[in-house]
């Protein structure tokens, strides 16, 4: 009896394996959304799977399989943050897989297993002194006043 119960538990845990995902917004590192999603077709790219996840959860977004423009209206048309002397920051949604940012668009990335972790982060790129100095740095480190209340 114990042996068959153990085997059933192992079989259920393997069949329930799914990628984990989270969406981290503008103001702090706590996820706005998180969960898991079983990938049954590994020929679908990560962009297609992102769209499926967002639609399944009813997450309001604008975008397509190669980019996400807005999640819950952020950044909307407020993606440009001017600074002194012509410097500026641009806000946008960036993705990570297993803690690293792949060097290509999301529609060119394919998950390899249901052990992967997908993370969407509202990030920024910084144009400073005539060159790009940062890319996809989490915006919660800035806490943009357009989206975040002061602490």
Protein language model annotation of sequence segments:
Residues 4-14:
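Sec-dependent N-terminal signal peptides
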Residues 16-151:
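Ubiquitin-like/PB1-type beta-grasp interaction modules and other compact soluble beta-rich domains
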